[in-house]
Amino acid sequence: MDGARPKPSTTGRVCFLYIAQEHQTLHSVSAAVALARLRPDVEVDLVSTRPETIAFLEEVIQALGDAPVGLRLAGPAWLRGLTPAGGAPLKLPMLAANAAMLGGYDIIVAPERTTAALRWFGVRRAQLVYTQHGAGDRGGPFEPRLKAFDLVFAAGPKQRDRMVEAGLVPRERCAVVGYPKFDVVDALRPTPPRLFAQDRPIVVYNPHFDAKLGSWPAWGPAILAAFAAQDRYNLIFAPHIRLFEGADPRSVPSLAAFVDCPQIHLDLGGVAAIDMTYTRMADVYLGDVSSQVYEFLRVRRPCLFLNSHHVPWRGDESYRHWTFGPVVEALGDIVADVDAARGGHGAFLPAQEEGFRDTFDLTGESSSVRAARAIERLLNRRHRPG
């Protein structure tokens, strides 16, 4: 997997670009592998601004069965040196510094929207593909930068219809491909770790990083304290990686007291927090607006949601997932609320079934192959004679 490896009769160059932390790679790396296998005449490179991401990608590619892809670390090194611990190098400066190199590709595939800025930095020839990095309901991802992309992926009809109806993406530039991350998880088959000495039902608490939307600032420490004071449940605290940027919990004042609590496991950004290990092993999902709830619902189970901002959420498509379980409107006895969510799960099962079906189109070929074929079609149009 040498980024400089030659390919005979190359008919195109495709870059899969990663300028954030490792969690975003799982949404497209399997499509890169599938494309390289489908089209050995196409140069497929995975480019990242973080050496940690390059190492992680190499492991994942091996787990997927290897493929003729290149791995390339983007510079400059001095700009990487300005990166805070656990974070990613500044995205816009890195894009500006690498615009000339990236502009040499026919297609640039990215899991996040900041890559649209390449158009500002003079990249005109290369076509841009946005894969998404989640399939949630939050309104933030549905925004004008989508118009900069030549092709946008959707996991299913929900995402596609919302983007098209908002006028952000023409229907012909939107490809419904399913959810390639599921293919990666199935290939990795992470073994559930033994986290707790006592076997109890497991709750995964997964707050979002955005303080304007997430439950952590107002309610998070109190929730951890409540679980530390009971003995009926084990709790995995696995927030979005950007909430604490992968810090050591001992260095976070609001978390240090819970580090040695036998019924609480803290993970602020390890591999198990991004490869669905925790959402697969948990019995109950506790969260706010993270798209990970849909990954959890690959197997339908009880959910409980936290409205710490007292938003009027009913009927708002950005909160559709809050119809999949009870919503806590005022923090009281959170353990009793979990009990109630488990006991009343049957009432929410139809909404979970419908919501999952609208979110993920998993029919036909694997999601990774469908994504690769969509990129291949874009490449073929680019190189069509005349």
Q: Can you say where each PLM-predicted feature lies in the sequence?
A:
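Nucleotide-activated donor-dependent transferases that construct or modify glycoconjugates
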Residues: 3-22, 204-205
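Active-site and donor-binding regions of nucleotide-sugar-utilizing enzymes
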Residues: 19-38, 45-186
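Conserved catalytic-core segment of nucleotide-activated headgroup transferases in glycan assembly
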Residues: 24-39, 43, 182-255, 326, ...
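Donor nucleotide-activated moiety binding/catalytic core segment of transferases
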Residues: 249-294
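C-terminal amphipathic helix plus adjacent low-complexity
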Residues: 340-386
